[in-house]
Amino acid sequence: GKEVELSSQIFFRIIENRHLVRQVVCMIQKEVAERIEASPGSKTYGILSVFLQAFYHIEYLFTVGEKVFDPPPKVKSAVIRLTRNERVELGCEEKLFFNVVKTGFNQRRKTLRNSIRGIIPPGFDSPYLNLRPEQLGITDFLQLCQDIEKNRNIGDKA
């Protein structure tokens, strides 16, 4: 719903300004908190999980029940803590990383070979391309992007 979209926008702003934001403690809809801390392979793992986990260590602190609010909302809340990790450089162009992750998850039922076809250079191959986006961890996405970038650069010099 609207709450999910609003909190997503806030988190994207935090990522953009991560050099200024060392730590965040916030209360959000439980569903969003679960999405943020999700691991590869889970149904809730997605764009927000990958982007935030690339730069922040996520801790799910506790659940807040509906009854503590007046009037009570229809959803549970959760308090989470984001602490910026030591990853300063992605090892690849940030724009490429965001593009690969977004494009991949926008067609999450397809393998990356099919979903990111427009991003990968001609003739490029990688074992990651045979997987669906939810099967890749943060380091896998970074490695894929570094490989794409290296391959693009080889093509540029020809």
Predicted regions and their residues:
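Class I S-adenosyl-L-methionine
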Residues: L6-Q135, Q143, N153-A158
